[in-house]
Amino acid sequence: RRADWIVTLKGYTSDVWGSEIYTKDNRYGRYQSYGSVQIMGKGNPVSRAGSGFVQEGWDWNRLPGTTTIHLPFNLLDSPLKGTTMARSKENFSGSSSLDGKNGMFAMKLAERDYENFTPDFVARKSVFCFDNRMVCLGTGISNSNADYPTETTLFQTKYNGKEPKVGEDNYWLHDGYDNYYHVVDGTVRAQVAEQESRHEKTREITKGKFSSAWIEHGKAPKEGTYEYMVLIQPSASDLDELRKTPAYEVLQRDQTAHVVYDKKTGITAYAAFEAYQPATDKVFVAIPAETMVMYAKESDKGIRLSVCDPNLNIEEKTYTTKEPSRPITKEIRLKGHWTLTSPMENVRLEQQGDQTVLTVTCLHGQPIEMFMENK
């Protein structure tokens, strides 16, 4: 969150359902938590409508940021007449932060096995947030649905007269609400179109004109990928500068990990989907599976570091539960001999040869933040 805008990132797990669908509410809401990236920053006061969201004509397949199978509305409608509270079989979905100013989101996406769903639909998604810049990555996008295309939506906004392709060589895509997108990896489609949709309560036909852009993964994709950058309300000089010199570097993007270095903040952020043992990392020897790590230099020998496992670690998988979240221990190996600048109850360090074993006890899906120095 900065100034007068906010971004909301949404996933779901075995403990947190992806959407609340009822008999006469949110009938087409299946994709709300498939990695959505909602920007709200326009309107007086700032509102959803002011930021480009209106229901009339809205394509429920295209929530910004989500990776989805683009279905006809009769198939997207919940197969259950009453309540649908779909949860994932995966537990790695959530966010972390560093110094309360910058953050990241990561998820293992896996669709449920319901009628008109595609149960082998999987993907690994991440969003890295630095100041007014977001880096969005996707890997392993796969499913067997050969009837309908799989897409990752950049934006869908009520058309306000501003064209989606802007800049020299159409380098930037513009959502019409002062947010700009550049796709590094992916086949992009952009359109301004009159759309026909359905009302989420009554299923009545609705219509509206929207500006949209998305990345095509095709039908029944195998190991699809994407990479794009988002600038939120940038200045003209921001657009010019970042076109010439990107502010970030992707250090790894595969099924094991998504790793991004941001040049302006100096932050390196890791979404480790599987056990990660980087060969040439400056700091880490090993990060365990399903862990988010962020760090930045604070001094010549010191770093600010955060570690997070978003899993609530709740054993009881019922509709609701009184069971509290349980601690999870993460063991991270660092190069060299590190010490904490101040003791912490939930952090332990042990020197092993020329490495340091950092043991962090995570709880409630919250990041544990610390200062460390290298001797």
PLM regions: where:
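C-terminal His-loop and adjacent cap/lid subdomain of alpha/beta-hydrolase
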Residues: 345
